Amino acid sequence: MRRTALLVSAALLTSLLPLAVARAADDPAPVPVDRFEGEVPFANPPAGGIFTWGGDTDDPPTLALSKRDDAPEGDQVLSGTYDISGYGGFTHDFAFAEPAHDWSAHKGIRLWWEGQDNGRKIALELKDGGANGEASELWTTSFTDDFSGWKQIEIPFTDFVYRTDYQPVGGIDHVLGLTQMWGYALTLPVGAPGRFALDGVELYGKADQSLRASVLTDSAVYPVDEGGTATVKVTVATTGSAPIDEPVTVAYETAGGTASPSDYTALKGELTFPAGTASGTTRTVRVHTLKDKAAAEAAETVPLKLTVTGAKAPAETPQVVIDAHGLPYLNAKLPVRKRVADLLSRMSLAEKAGQMTQAERGAVGTGADITAEDLGSLLSGGGSTPTPNTAEAWARMIDSFQLRARATRFQIPLIYGVDAVHGHNNLVGATVMPHNIGIGATRDPRLAERTGAVTAAEVRATGVPWDFAPCLCVTRDERWGRSYESFGEDPALVESMETVVQGLQGPRDGRELKDDDKVLATAKHFLGDGGTAYGSSTTGSYTIDQGVTTVTRKQLDAVHLAPYRTAVDRGVGTVMPSYSSLDIVGDGLGPVKMHARADMINGVLKGRLGFDGFVISDWNGIDQIPGDYASDVRTSVNAGVDMVMAPYAYKDFRTALVAEVRAGRVSERRIDDAVSRILTQKFRLGLFEKPYADTSGAPGIGSAGHRAVAREAAAASQVLLKNSGGVLPLRTSQKVYVAGSNADDIGNQSGGWTVTWQGSSGDITPGTTILEAMRKNSAALTYSQDASAPTAGHDVGVVVVGETPYAEGVGDVGNGHDLELSAADRAAVDKVCAAMKCAVLIVSGRPQLVGGRLGDIDALVASWLPGTEGDGVADVLYGRRPFTGRLPVTWPRSEAQLPINVGDPTYDPQFPYGWGLTTRTAVPEGGPATLAALATAAGAAERAGAGDRGRALVDKARLIVQRKADGRITAAFAAPFADAEHLLLTGRYAEAVRKLAQAYRAI
């Protein structure tokens, strides 16, 4: 799923002024900020200048100073182009080494903008206070490009609001002081290419003195039981926390809302804060609600109107909410189906459409739209985190959003979702598990379930009840940038690892979903995302991700559908369609986007498989369906998508859906089905009874117990591909030389989807690097990343190489990535392995091509992406645990072989699927006679239903065969060896041993 954080400011429209702007006689002269005549360089912090930024390599806009005859001021303008899928824009930071600027004498900021009349919003952000432009407090607003040609846009400073979705230092004083300004930023529209031109940024007008003081309330929503009293705290605050220098009055009055006069005691009065009042002084207003004769009512609102003199008023009118009560759907003792039916019967079409809408948390700002749009769900895209990124901040943020839902008529709680795909990977300090490719290598379903349980506990402890995991893709081409999200290339292996669903959700019947350590799981991406053909993608510069999967119906069922059959049997609560297109041979339809395939979503998933959860679209997934937006909405919902992830277009989606229903193009029955499915999961999660975060599990986040599970998983995921001369395990007495780019890098060993969407190299979250773990076990260790330190005098070398982080199509081969080691890593391998016995660890999300160096390497380990617990890798390197991992995918000899998978008619890999040497102290001896006896015993175990014994017999046969092969892998050997692994996973133990015997004979 594509997830990125995006700044979305409050929708505050500004004045669009004519070319000539009058200035009042007492206004100060405008002060230029940028003239774009070359006086400000393009430069990155800490230097002063203009720089671009974005969610990935394609998102930053292009910028240039262009000479224009029509430039509003001077000869040049700042112009550029953009094509942003995540987020992107540009910033002018003032130099860190120079004093901040004082803008407090002015009314606002204005600029010339060349309109394209595209109706899109441009966000403008100011950087106030703090140490510098990257450690300041952010204030934001926006204007709409709904005009053509040059216009001067004036934005009073009073229009800027505190940015709630992100603050680089967690906020400072929540007051726009204007005395220490560090620059500004513009965020450009997302979703379609565009161009822009900007000129003459300057300060204008005389300062509004009310900006120096602000009136705040402690909340925007105050829920109370009928007959209860709401206490509204009103606070005055000033820039720099100085006492107010002029009196501030706050007149208050209860007026309007949905409550009737008999529901509360009318209130009217005034609060006074005299000159000299200390900043932070608080007064209280109490609103008393009344019990009435109605035994059952929906929620009702009582706005408390505040009129402020002498200071900036709160951005919103606080709302007292008299909670819904007495209605059947609120009765936790009733069966879920009855609660759903009762609530559904009361809802309007607009409210139902809201439940089918999911927005990005950054898009809703303070959350007012949650109430206004009756939103059913929010998500955090990759990297969309609160500031600071702590468990406590996550819980506070989500609770603040849930509070907004309390102001809706039926107080339907939000369901909040995140991509916790290898632990709660969004949260700094969480336990980061190996990615799925490594979990598949463990061949340990019980361990997979335990990793899911740890993930669920840490996710739920931050207030998140829904995880967009697991990925059940069957990866068939390692050029795919999402290969590491798969458990492997064999559907039988993927199915065996689906115990993770129980780790996340608990038992199939969902009875534990209300618990504080369980979350709703999502099987993704339905259907065939791992089978797309290289070169078939039409998404930006992607080469394979989101492309076309071309299969027969038989292949579709056997390879790609099988894991979903298992997931439905396990009770998975939600399913997410794939961005990819499915082209079924012979059906005459050609490639059709999965979000539009009613035959697959309605027909197969909900019909044939009997899936009773709800279907959630991927990030802007419906936008890829051909046609206009109304058509996208109609097609996807009619195809069976129940909730649409419309991160920033959530209003457009809800409006379009209502219109499609009213036009008769989407039936109300289809809407009721979708909303029933969504409400069912919300009731099962216990959100109506406990909408707010239960943080009792927060102490377990990143705890020793949780990290022990991740450490065990990291150890079990290590696959020993070669071990000439018994180089591994290492001895603690040996003098070890360690080199390579991935030896000492938490970010690289964790991979993409770690803290941010793409992940990043470096010390991004607490953990133990492989080098740090090795130091704990070695009496004498030398580390030299590039192997430049002297190599003499060492007993053995360990070179840790591989990939840097990426996610999704950004990591596609041909999109700036390949399957080759970097030049620096190749040089380190060559130098160390020429000087001493060496072991090479490949830390990567997929196989890397090492055939040309294999003869020089004594030991080779596929370490995958082990996560934060490097101790697990050291455990097997030093023999604390044996190597037991097996390849979850085929390791190719060359890129030309791709795609290459178990069962292919031509199969000649470097290492076959299922290959994995062991460092157990006793590897069994034997030959053809032993293998024949093992086949007989395996057949008996199979007939008796003795799975553990059958698997043990196949394991013994495999070890015998691998011992004899000693790395001599030919096509005649590899094919039956890989086939045996598939047979093992499908419970055909005797046939698996016979295939291994065939491989033995081919050596």
Q: What are the roles of these predicted feature ranges?
A:
Residues 325-924:
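Glycoside hydrolase catalytic-domain context in secreted enzymes
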Residues 924-1003:
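Long, charged/polar, soluble alpha-helical segments
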Residues 208-326:
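Short boundary segments that mark the start of a structured unit
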Residues 23-31, 202-216, 239-242, 309-334, ...:
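Low-complexity, Pro/Thr/Ser/Gly/Ala-rich linker/spacer regions in secreted
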Residues 1-24:
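Secretory targeting and sorting signals
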Residues 115-117, 161, 240-242, 293, ...:
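Short, acidic/polar linear motifs in exposed loop/turn regions
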Residues 109-111, 184-186, 232-236, 285-287, ...:
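Buried hydrophobic-core signal for structured, non-transmembrane domains
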Residues 26-210:
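Beta-rich carbohydrate-recognition modules and glycan-binding surfaces
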